[in-house]
A protein has these predicted regions:
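Compositionally biased, intrinsically disordered low-complexity regions
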Residues: 72, 200, 223, 246-248, ...
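Non-catalytic, conformational "gating/processing" segments within enzyme and secreted inhibitor domains
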Residues: 50, 89-244
């Protein structure tokens, strides 16, 4: 199971935004891949080299899109640049009897801040967002936001905010939940303890094993494999750097263009 959440806080907004044309779908997909990779690269730069990074570019893009809906002028242009001209409104993520994919959006507004009704209506209509006005000085509001996040990630993420600042006027959140079986399942009995070569040290960890045919590629010395989930719509792409190299050394070579080529 995979859960993710992203929150954005806003000091002011103006709800005037024109959605870009959706005719160039291929370019749109390429831009989305580029955004995801750049988002990961920027985030990775903020942590220590021996720390793990787990994030959801989709959640970040949805939260930023909700902000972009209320932007204009130079701010709108900056959102366009970051998101590649794409807006991530509510969409069918393909849940069925086999897999579960849920995305939920919410907008929390300070009772000291007024917001245009048409901006709220747009988020409710296009993003299926839950919208509420709250007292940001009340600690119960933080608890309510965390409870909402927990509810929409099946309890996997129960805490997203510690506190709210008196200067905060809005909180926008996207919560994402994913649970699906592998198309080619791993045999639990085949799991064995093996050595994982980390950046700091080698460590013995349980490793799954599966012998089957998968999509495979090599690029800049890295090995890539795609592990599809049942149904074929979603997959996990695993990148193994050359021996002795860490993620920081290979990230410059992982681009949207390189990803499409593979």
């Amino acid at each position: 199971m995979i859960s993710a959440a992203a929150a954005a806080m806003l000091l002011s907004c103006s709800p005037k935004y024109v959605k870009p044309s959706s005719t160039a779908s291929a370019q749109s997909d390429s831009d989305k891949i580029e955004f995801a990779l750049e988002f990961f690269k920027k985030t990775n730069q903020t942590v220590d080299y021996d720390e793990n990074v787990v994030l959801s570019p989709y959640s970040a893009a949805v939260a930023l899109s909700m902000l972009a809906e209320g932007a204009e002028g130079e701010t709108k242009a900056e959102f366009d640049d970051v998101l590649g001209g794409n807006l991530y409104a509510a969409e069918d993520l393909g849940s069925n009897d086999v897999l579960t994919v849920k995305s939920a959006n919410s907008l929390w507004i300070s009772d000291n801040f007024s917001i245009r009704n048409r901006y709220v209506s747009l988020l409710e209509k296009d993003y299926d967002a839950f919208v509420t006005v709250q007292n940001f000085a009340d600690p119960a509001t933080v608890k309510e936001i965390n409870n909402w996040c927990s509810e929409h990630t099946a309890g996997k993420i129960g805490h997203i905010l510690d506190e709210l600042s008196p200067n905060d006027v809005m909180v926008l959140i996207n919560a994402l939940y994913f649970n699906a079986p592998w198309e080619k399942a791993f045999d639990e009995n085949a799991t064995e303890d093996m050595v994982f070569h980390g950046v700091v040290e080698d460590k013995e960890v349980p490793m799954m094993y599966r012998k089957a045919t998968f999509d495979y590629a090599e690029y800049q010395g890295c090995q890539l494999i795609r592990l599809p989930y049942e149904g074929g719509r979603y997959s996990m792409v695993v990148v193994l750097p050359p021996y002795g190299m860490g993620i920081d050394q290979i990230l410059p070579y992982i681009t949207g263009t390189a990803y499409k080529v593979q």
